[in-house]
């Protein structure tokens, strides 16, 4: 799937026409049309386009979204630590 097909499918999914998307991005309807027809490979308004479509720039370019959040599974505690109350913690230091 190319950037042009991703933009078009996401635009249709959001129920926007080319003119409405162009207005959100801050460009012309002709620019969106050229992008969707594959005449523009990497538009200069890519960050604005991604924001208007609610996707990442990486998704527009590659079809993947790199997230810094990953599920690592259930983490088991390795040991136990003593609970220190505020009173006890304060008695350790002298001022």
Curated annotation (Swiss-Prot):
Gene3D superfamilies: lambda repressor-like DNA-binding domains (1.10.260.40). Homodimer, when bound to an operator. Keywords: DNA-binding, Repressor, Transcription, Transcription regulation. GO terms for molecular function: DNA binding. This is Repressor protein CI. It comes from the Viruses. It holds the Pfam family HTH_3. Residues 18-37 bind DNA. InterPro entries: Cro/C1-type_HTH, Lambda_DNA-bd_dom_sf. Binds to two sets of three contiguous operator sites in the phage genome. Residues 7-60 form the HTH cro/C1-type domain. Coiled coil: none annotated. The keyword Ribonucleoprotein does not apply.
């Amino acid at each position: 799937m190319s950037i042009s097909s991703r933009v078009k499918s996401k635009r249709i999914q959001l129920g926007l026409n080319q003119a409405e998307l162009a207005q959100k991005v801050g460009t012309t309807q002709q620019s969106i049309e050229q992008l969707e027809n594959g005449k523009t490979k990497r538009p200069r308004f890519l960050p604005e386009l991604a924001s208007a479509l609610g996707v990442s720039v990486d998704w527009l370019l590659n079809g993947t979204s790199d997230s810094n959040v990953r599920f690592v599974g259930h983490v088991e505690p390795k040991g136990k630590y003593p609970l220190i109350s505020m009173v006890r913690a304060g008695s350790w230091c002298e001022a």
